[in-house]
Amino acid sequence: DKGNVPDGTYTGKAPSFGVMKEMELAVTFKDNAIVSIETVCAGSATQYNEDEYSNIYATVEEKLYPRIIEAQSLDVDAICGATVSSNAAKTILRNVIDANGGNSAGWNIPVEKSTEVVELRDYDVAVVGLGSSGVASFLSAAENGCTVFGMEAAAKIGGNGTNTAGPLGVNPAAQVEANGGENFVDPDELYTAWMEYCEDDAKGEIVKLFIDESGKTFGWLADNYDFAFLPSMFSFYDSHGWKLWTMYSGKDGGSKDDAYNAAMAKALTYNEKNDYKTELRATSLLKEDGKVVGVEAVAYDGTVYRVYADCVVLADGGYIGNAEMTTKYTGSVWHTKGMTQCDGFGISQCLELGGALYNPDVAVEDHIAALDNIIRSDDYSNDDKSLLTSLVLDLNYQMIDSKGQSFDGNYNGLGLAFNAWEAGANYYVLINQEEYDSIKENGLISYNVPMFFGQGGAYTEGTPVSNLDDIMEMGKAFGDVIVADSLEDLSQQLGMDIALSDVHGQTEGKIYCIKGAAYVYSTCGGMDVDTNMNLVLEDGSSMENVFVVGNNSLGTLNASNKAYVLYGGAAQGWALTSGRLAGQIAAERFAG
């Protein structure tokens, strides 16, 4: 029973992916049917200076809402790549229905799935995943004469490549020219430093290949497609100060999404057979007599596609969306800013083929520390939310890791945002009673504004935080604050032993514990590859028609159980460069 919602337009709100405002929708009913869903606020801004409307949210507006209206059901699947926004929209719809005479449970009408099987034959290359590495593979193979079919599980292409600032490139020609013709680094010195940082655990021939080829990728994308790179290069955390990465976008003020979409549109013109589909998730590799001959995938509507190709490029972005794999290889299930449709398909399939892992346990890509549960509710002020965030980032207080050990978030000078992963999935800031009272009476020791997920609150240093009790109550409501009477009490509430005898000298009195977390983009380890980007098997041989690119093979550039290299943009640079090289080699072997 759906109940009966009177004709009219109703508005509703719910927290979504953004950190500034809740999603707000206007939903129109006629004859107890949803006839329109309009966006009032997309709720997508992940930073105080971002637009609330994002390209990820656009996939919800363009795909989810029409499907709900067509099916008159809330059982429509969430949009892959926009799950949080999809679920927020469904929450709003349920609340609107229930608040206006309807019964949202009655709207859970099963949506029939297709049983069709589509076979696509005679492709030279099938690309699984159309983030940076997959798009680069597609472009490179297509421009060199291959017929190419690509598939992307999400509803849009570009993946994390549309969310990151930019890639690493060693001495790219245009930027060197803008630098007066002077190289930014000596390649041999960079190679030596790279291998020293990785304690010789990275694969030397791949590191050298990346150093030699990454700069060329900038020119390739800028000269042939709608990508634009700043003329300046930048340094990152590395102590040498080498300028090895830059920011990129679409040309003529376009976005990264514009650049990826335009590039793929151009690649489709290279021959009439080239094609790609979004919302198409690979489920297995097709094999005949032990040889890989293509990919089987399922579309959002249930249609099964069997794509037969001479070679396959596995470009599906690592395994950050696979809890079992992240627990096995990195020790935790992580909070993410990156795309969680990256579920380890490529790596799992490589292992079934007898592929060799290479540093699958490289640390996750972490540049963000924040509250465990970022407070997205409009019921609280951004000032209060920002004050609590400042405290969870404050190195002046005692911190412990996920095992209850004392944790120094800046032990190496790189800062908490870079080091938070070393605490495990969570870290905790412990404030003793004296410190707490000082904040109320004298203000914060320091006001910490995060690089990401900043909510734009205002605070004047030295101002007493007289409403600190209210801020702590807000944190408690979202599971971010635990108030304990003692270390023993805190240990019981957290469910772990705490290896401290005091909190900054306090042995008695309340402890105010704020729960923080690393927010990560992706995993950084995976399979072994050779210099042709081919999968290396356990016996040391290579599989010449299986290419493994991007995060799926990023472990070859990094060290086991260590943060990935400190030069900036390494993951993005590898994605674009490994894809370019894979497409080029695939064309040499399989075109025509």
What spans do the regions from the language model cover?
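A glycine-rich dinucleotide-binding beta-alpha-beta segment and adjacent secondary-structure elements
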Residues: A42, S284-L286, V483-S560
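Core beta-strand elements of the Rossmann-like FAD/NAD(P) dinucleotide-binding domain
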Residues: L120-Y123, D301-C311, S542-M543
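Conserved redox-cofactor binding core of oxidoreductases
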Residues: I211-T303, N322-E324, A370, D502-T507
